[in-house]
Amino acid sequence: EITSPIDLVTADDGLVASHFGHPVIGLKPSQIAALTQICSTDTSASVTAEASRDWWPLTMHWGLVGEVPAQAAAVCRPTSTEQIAHLLSYCNEEQIPVTAAGGRSGVCGASIPLYGGVVLDTTAMQGVVSVDDESLTVEILPGTFGPDLEAHLAPMGLTVGHYPQSFDIATVGGWVACRGACQYS
């Protein structure tokens, strides 16, 4: 299963460099503690570096020399819309930048946290909530990957019929956010 661009080359301490080199907004210990109370939060260098890039070809090249475009201070993984609302409200109050990300399958750098802060990773919100076989509608959580959605629908004789090139590594939330248009769509 490929869910990440190429492996990052890191220094012995696990750190990577920011390619853009401009100042980014870090987090105070009190802010990290508050974020941790809201949802799962990771501040480790390896996790924040990985979450700070996508499939943009330049980021893959920079990864070979241990660089990410810009690095988030934390990766937050909410599991509910209530946690997302609380997280966004808190970050707004504290003036912490937030960059939304899912599968990070984009190739233009849209999920790069240019100003640091928090990456709001939706991939902890996976699954199919409901399927209405009469109206042929499905309610899906935003972090659900394309193959998982199709695997859930196939036994019912249903398909979404949406197959972007990034199908295996893209999430439904990303399809919606980017007005996904693709082959067979």
Task: Describe the residue ranges of each PLM region.
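FAD-binding glycine-rich core of flavoenzymes that anchor FAD
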Residues: T81-S185
